[in-house]
Swiss-Prot record:
This is NADH-quinone oxidoreductase subunit A. Its main location: membrane. The chain crosses the membrane at residues 10-30, 66-86, 91-111. NDH-1 is composed of 14 different subunits. Subunits NuoA, H, J, K, L, M, N constitute the membrane sector of the complex. Its EC number is 7.1.1.-. The keyword Transmembrane helix applies.
Amino acid sequence: MASVYENSYMIVLIFLLLGILLPVVALTLGRMLRPSKPSAAKATTYESGIEPFHDANIRFHARYYIFALLFVIFDVETLFLYPWAVAYDKLGLFALIEMFIFVVMLLVGLAYAWKKKVLQWL
């Protein structure tokens, strides 16, 4: 008989397998059952009903990707800070110290990016 500890991991394993298996099965069934009628018109880029006048593949400078990555990092930071701010009264001093360390780590990363002139556009 499995212990409670092993049973907890078994539930996580089942959810992990279902989380991987269900999308794979759904995508595979969709690919097998859909009608396939490829044409040149379907392969063109859609631009609001207008005939495309240039190639859709545009190269962006790497700094835009870095800037977008920094945005995502600080956007995720707000996702972590919001629940903490809502439950601040119940969490106590330990959570305050944890959040302080978290924000300081992000500020150190921001200072590093600023020092490396990642945020400078010119």
